[in-house]
């Protein structure tokens, strides 16, 4: 999961639910519109809070693995190391419905910040093989979109760790 740096409480909730659903990675991304959010979740102390929430969610859900939580990254870092076998999705209301997408593991899902991706960011993601997919016509909060997208991908691929990168 490539989640936007956003409101602290929403990020913690998102981390918890993505862990319950079996995400293997949960990477906070500083998108252009992430800069305006306050108080936002970022930094090493916040990352420790995320990991603690994830450990609790792992126990509650009887999960098998704890997601990796790397340091906050920029769009340049997101695009720097593409994996050739990775299915890359970006949530965008103009995309085709995610449920119609042909998926193959591993899958990485980019979630936009409050206010959405800027056109330049979306263009760069598309150029980097991120396929635009939609969760429908409604504009969702980032944490709702992350959980909905991950649940659909997990259901489509099955529940093993090798089938959902997150």
Q: Could you say what each language-model-derived stretch is?
A:
Residues 82-122, 130-133:
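Active-site/ligand-binding-proximal alpha/beta "capping" segment
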Residues 119-166:
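Structured adenosyl-cofactor binding patch, chiefly the S-adenosyl-L-methionine
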Residues 10-11, 38, 99, 117, ...:
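Secondary-structure boundary/capping motif
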Residues 3-4, 114, 138, 142:
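Glycine- and other small-residue-rich loops at beta-strand/loop junctions that grip anionic moieties
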Residues 73-79, 96-98, 139-140:
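A short acidic, often aromatic-flanked loop/helix-cap motif at beta-alpha or helix-coil junctions
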